[in-house]
């Protein structure tokens, strides 16, 4: 099982679309942890450091059976919200 998720910055409304085969809660915690490390020039992590992780929330927007389907749907949702 794969999930497509959306992370929203509640200050400026900017979005990040991603996919995972773990729970979205686990994936969100990974993003938070990565933002605290030396990952530079990554827009999501830069924004989390600038605005604070408490201004971001995650929600599941789709479910996929296969990795291939998840990749296709991730592209679809990125275009949809662009």
Segments the model singles out, each with a brief description of its role:
Residues 1-82:
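Structure-specific nucleic-acid interaction/processing domains
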């Amino acid at each position: 099982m794969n999930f497509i998720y959306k992370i929203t910055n509640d200050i400026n409304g900017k979005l990040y679309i991603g996919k995972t085969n773990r729970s979205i809660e686990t994936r969100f915690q990974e993003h938070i942890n990565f933002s605290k490390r030396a990952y530079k020039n990554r827009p999501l992590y830069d924004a989390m450091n600038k605005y604070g992780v408490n201004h971001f929330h995650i929600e599941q927007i789709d479910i996929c059976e296969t990795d291939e389907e998840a990749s296709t749907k991730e592209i679809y949702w990125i275009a949809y919200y662009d």
